[in-house]
Amino acid sequence: MTINQLIVIGGGIAGLTCAESYSHLKPNDKVTILSCSPILKTVCNVQKISKVLESFEVFETQFTDIEFKNPNISVIICDVDSIDINNRIVKTDKGNFKYDYLSICSGAKPNLVKESPYLIGIRDTETIVDLKNRLSNAKRIVIVGNGGIALELIHEIKNCQIIWSIKDKHIGNAFFDKDAADFLFRSKQIIDDDNHDKKNVVKEQQQQQQKDGILLNEDELIAKNQNISSQSNSSLYKSESGSALGPQWYSKYNFKTTDQYNKNNQEKKYNFNENVNIQYSTFLDEIYSNHDKKLNQEIINNNNNGDGDDKEDWPIYVKLSNGNLFGCNFIISATGVIPNSTILTKDNNNNNNNKIIKLSNEGAIIVDEQMKTSVDRIYSAGDVCSIEWSESEVWFQMRLWSQARTQGRYTAQCIANESVKNTPQQDNLDQICTNFEFELFAHATKFFGFKVIMLGLYNAQGLNLNLDNNNQNEENQDNIKIYTREIIGEQYVKVILKNGRLIGSLLIGDTDLEETFENLILNQIDLSGYGAEILNPEIDIEDYFD
């Protein structure tokens, strides 16, 4: 029996999933993970929600734990210098490693808007710890970007003024249209107001109990009032317990500012409106240090805009494209990521033969339907790769943790299949993943404390529709209809039908519709006769289409 050597570059979700999945399929083969960090990201507590949709928790683990759990996996902490394609060798600062198969899962890196010691990007544990440390003394920060990380930060950072610069006309444009974004915006206001009122009730009860000689702690009082609040406000969303979905990294950290600043603002009511100053349709133009000679002139020019009347001596100032100037403690760049393929670009430029790994225009590694690159025996998965082979109308690539896990598992299956091709082992190899998982886009996550399920073309991707100006019940080109229903503070449901068939759905809150809508998209049942009634809450649709 031939023993193959698989080398995996990268210790993120895609890389570790690929390595562990291949180890399961080929326990006698050798697997080596080349990681620049001793901390690897692993997936635990996987729960199947439906055929395609699943939830899981992401944990960070020491590489020694991975080696202990998988005897045929070894982890080398190193920096990859280059790949010798002709001789199948990966060159690193810790030596050279020969491979039979190579899986490049080097992920992506933050797309920083500017270079500055006062600007950080959020990508790994180190940057999260850096953020937490900086926030401990921060009074005001600037967040640039409108994607998932920006939304999570806006929700989690408390008692700190936030200037939020977004290039779009509404929040969350990377995931949501204007209607869904408005639902989240208004729901957060309602919930924040309700939470503030509950704290005031607790405070009043504590004062009264002190007079009566009885004192319960705050947790006991909140628990005591939980039934009252739930009866008086049925639309209040109640966060469900259970496993965190996607990269719920923020749940492990307490993002609060200094005690002194909290004390100074103890009586100030912070909600989404007052705490966050959203600068719509803007981008970061310039960054000035407080010693910059150009700063004084900018302050003079902006005496009626931004921070013109602000007497605080800030370490850094930000000028936005609308001319507004804001002082802050630091800046968070949350403008997405770019494929981490720098080493391959260098290799391709220095390669004198025709064996080069083809990259897309954005620098991602192009793979075929077997996750194979343009070079034999080299595969790729996760944020660093570009999938252009899926023929499904309702699947598209998005750089998400859920897709990184799927791609890592499927890549391991493809490599294992190739390694036993035309051998006696071919018929005995397990099949843990197929390309069926690329038939439907499905992602579960949370935003602003709400469970969010995205299915198919949930935001009409690729349909050339302007949802921000679209009448939800008006018929569009290609017989496309969009229906929505919402209960502010509780749930939002959107469905997109093309020629009477469901092709996408967005579910926010506890709707219990994810499995039903997934089946309707996959089975392409004609729903044209139902119209908007498909979202009628009085109809038990999950039973009707069971």
UniProtKB/Swiss-Prot annotation:
Pfam families: Pyr_redox_2, Rubredoxin_C
Domain of life: Eukaryota
SUPFAM superfamilies xref list: FAD/NAD(P)-binding domain
Entry's cofactor comment: Binds 1 FAD per subunit.
Family: Belongs to the class-I pyridine nucleotide-disulfide oxidoreductase family. PYROXD1 subfamily.
InterPro entries on file: FAD-bd_OxRdtase, FAD/NAD-bd_sf, FAD/NAD-binding_dom, FAD/NAD-linked_Rdtase_dimer_sf, Rubredoxin_C
Coiled coil ranges: none
UniProt cofactor(s): FAD
Name the UniProt record assigns to this protein: Pyridine nucleotide-disulfide oxidoreductase domain-containing protein 1
Keyword check for NADP: yes
Organism: Dictyostelium discoideum
Keywords: FAD, Flavoprotein, NADP, Oxidoreductase
Gene Ontology molecular function, alphabetical: oxidoreductase activity
Enzyme Commission code(s) on record: 1.8.1.-
